């Protein structure tokens, strides 16, 4: 018997974006357990916090019944500054494929946050024990920019099981965090292998591999991938595979000023180091090429940036480093204008895949090559 994760998100500082911080609201979302087990526990993160934060209530709803989650026996508890901690183990028989609803009330502001669940909604006040929920609130800017409700502080959900999963981590940016290719791929793995393999999402919106974006807004994009790699990827027990899907944001910050940090040479060196570390640990590495970015309205995109993206993709395709490669660029690009995403496959901003684009990416994976079962 051992603990195995069924849900995970990587954390970034929320102080630049108040709507991420969660104070005095309840966040509700659902997860599917890929394994059967006897107990459940939840891990909380306060990596970026300068002071403790308080969870004012946490419940798990399974088959219409409420189960209260505690820490040190208390329904109200704090998460220490600069640390992670677990809840008490909740005795709760969980069946493979079962849907669990998580309700979390924040009594204070939380610094660690992310938004990876399209089904997440929020309510003002504490609604963790309500038998019926009121209509959820949804900010207009979320729909406008394709954002999800944030789930502050919650880091991982684990089930105590006799059949621990082998873990594959999707290490990426918003294209990963939005879950439009990760969840369909996770479902394909589940349908093919049951709980033998689980795909965890370690994407952070705006994240770069090589570059820490400056300013308060930049901080909310998380530490650069080379810095967060150990915390967000290597610490997984049972890690067997990593999908590398970072770099398209680095390209957008390329200039004469950043050229010493963001270049094909720096990208290749950083990726080679990551792959070497993973291979030494017996972990398979899967590369994704960088998708088209031209037309993305939030940043000017220069010919030099596009040339760098193209050269990085050529390097990925030609490299013998990887155990497997999926060509996201070739899948998503407009055949008549290959620096742009095909109009059928983006959410309206010319960068982020819509449901059809995400499904196309997920279906492109050969599961035997992904898992190493081939």
Q: How should each PLM-predicted stretch be described?
A:
Residues 246, 289-290:
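A cross-domain feature marking catalytic cores of carbohydrate-active enzymes
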Residues 271-282:
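Surface-exposed amphipathic alpha-helices with a cationic face
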Residues 28, 58, 157, 165-270, ...:
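Conserved SGNH/GDSL esterase-like catalytic core that processes O-acyl groups on lipids
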Residues 1-171, 177, 183, 190-194, ...:
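N-terminal secretory targeting modules
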